[in-house]
Structures are given as C-alpha cells and as structure tokens.
Amino acid sequence: MTHKLRWRSVQLLCVLAAITLMAWPSSVSASCGAVSCFVVIGSQQQVPMAGLLTVNAIYNYTPSWTPAGQGGGIPFADQENRQLTLANLNSSQIWTHVQTATLDMNYGLTDRFGLQVTLPYKRVNSEANLGVATPVPYTDQGMGDMRVTMKYNLLPTLRSMVVLGVGVDFPTGTYQARASTGQMVESTLQLGRGNFGLLPSLYQTYEIIPHRINQFALVSYRHTFKNNDGYQFGDEVNLSGGLNIIPLEQSQWFVLTQQLNYRWMQNDAMDASLYQFNPATGTSVLLDPTVKFRAVPTTGSTYLAYSPGIMLNLWNFASAYAVVQIPVYRDFNGNLEQQVSYLFGMTKVFQLLGGS
C-alpha cells in the first residue's frame, strides 16, 4: 500500500483488553468484571513499508455497571488467601469506569515483516454498594501489560492485505496493589494480569472500490497463563469486520467507518477453597476446604457491538479518529455490563533509517 493510501484507509479496530473491577471495603473483594471498548485501528494491524514507523496515540473510555438490583450474586475472590466465597446480597449499585491511554508503535522491518509494541496506561475507578458495608470508592492508575507483536504480510498487493500476527503480553502492569484496608485487591481489579499471555491474530483488508470503499476484518485470540496467585484470566476471542467509506470523492480527507465487533470471554478460574457468605451474620461458611482450580462464577461474557466513527486527514500531517461503540447484544453472566464506550486517537507516520 502507498503512503497516501495509508491515510485514506486507516481502519478503526483495536483489542484493548483492560480488565478492571471494583474494590470491596471489608475483608473480601467481589469478583466484578469490566472490559474495555475494543475497536481496532488498521494502522496498528497493517505492516508498514520498510523503514516507516506508525505511531498511534489512543484514549479509550469504557463505563460498566450492573442493572438496578443486580450484582448481588457476584462472588468474592481472595487470591492472596486462595478463597472463593459465593454470595447472595442485595445490590443497589456496582460500577467501574476504565480509562486507557495507549501508545502504539508499529515499525516496518521489511515490506512484509513488522514489529509492534503497545504500551497502555490505565486508570480504574470503581464503587460497589452491596448493602452490607459502607461503599468505599477505589481508584488506581499506572502502566498495564505491554504487548509485543511480530507480524507478517501474507498478501501484499495494491488493493489487499492479509497480515498474520503473533503477540506476547508481558506482565509489566501492577499486580500487587492493595486497598485502603491493606488487603490485596482481587485479580480482576489489578492493572496487569500477573503473567505472560499469547495473542495470535489474522487481519484482512480489501479495497472494493479504490479510494472510496475499503473492507476489513480481524480475528484474534488471547490466552493468559495462570499467575503466581493461582488466578487465570479466561481466554478471549474477538471477531470484527466492517467498511471504511469516503462519501465524497473530492474529500479524500474525510472517512466514515462502520463496523461490528464480537467478543467471547471464557470464565476466569483460580486455585481456592470454597465458602458461602451469609449476609445475616456477616460471616462465611466453609463448603469445601480443598484448594483446587475452580471456575469463578459470573466471569465470562458474550458481547456484540456496532461501532460507527470518523477519520480525518489533518493537512497530511497526521490522522485523527473518533469511534463510539454501542452495545447490540450482551450477556455478562450476572456481572457488570459494558455500556456505550468511546475511543479517540491520532496516527502519525515517521520515516526512519532503512526506508527509501
């Protein structure tokens, strides 16, 4: 693809998995999940020409909450003491707001091989009112897990591209954060996942009408290994596809994007004994003292979203884009539900050594 075409066909798709949850103000933490908006930016997925560095600066805002009166069945996951406590509480409000600022650098080693480094900085705000304690807001911020991806362009033509990627998540994000009570916050509230992860992906794009309509699709899979606390985040599958449309031929600087994003997430699991919380007494009853690998109830989800957006070429200096992700179907298994999310970003291409 030419440099000029790169500006016109910046696809808006990204997989920013930022799993964050809420803090529990007493001696246990509820395992509530909140996920981030996932729109993919085509300039992240493509392989730049040799010597070109494509830089994306992205801001992502994703609110999540439980429907009114729900969320009381979310269990308490205490990974530090290897305890999983089932719950049945009266819940009036549980919410999380996740903000992620991402620096993504995509470099063309050759015209077919690329190297991508993704650095997320996350801020998590959360609060829960479960009717058994005074709600205490929780806030944390810092670096998330760094992702490094090697990519190969299987089909480099003027109108199409098929890119195979293999990414590795490095456990650079904080995983030992503690609440104001001194207790370690549960795994899903930490900024990082605490262990390495693998992320194979396949990206495809084709110009249906040159310089006017561009089709794109992406499939990716994430597997994170069990961390030292015995907690393992569930596998994740993402499927996305859509069109980039230039509505006016004389206005090549203005692009509309329309896409559908589907995500399936497996239940998390942890090494733990099993308890049942009794809200009448405020104590937990031991059900099974054996510490074994157990699925965490109410984790895992299925989600389908429609994501419209725009991209503007800023005087051939950079590209700016904005996307709104609107839920179409969601099954969050009794946990927090992702609401309308927003993504804003800018793309800039630099010529480094080795290019022509």
Locate each region found by the language model:
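Residues on the lipid-exposed face of transmembrane beta-strands in outer-membrane beta-barrel proteins
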Residues: 43, 57-59, 103-107, 117, ...
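Repeated loop/turn-to-beta-strand initiation elements of outer-membrane beta-barrel proteins
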Residues: 53, 113-115, 148, 157-162, ...
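Extracellular loop and loop/strand-boundary signature of outer-membrane beta-barrel proteins
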Residues: 42, 87-91, 132-138, 185-190, ...
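Long, hydrophobic/aromatic-enriched structural stretches that serve as scaffold segments
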Residues: 86-149, 153
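Transmembrane beta-strands of outer-membrane beta-barrel pores
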Residues: 59-65, 119-125, 154, 168-174, ...
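Outer membrane beta-barrel transmembrane domains
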Residues: 68-70, 74-83, 230-356
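Residues that define the transmembrane beta-barrel architecture of outer-membrane proteins
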Residues: 51, 97-101, 140-146, 160, ...
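Outer-membrane beta-barrel biogenesis signature
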Residues: 24-81, 174, 351-356
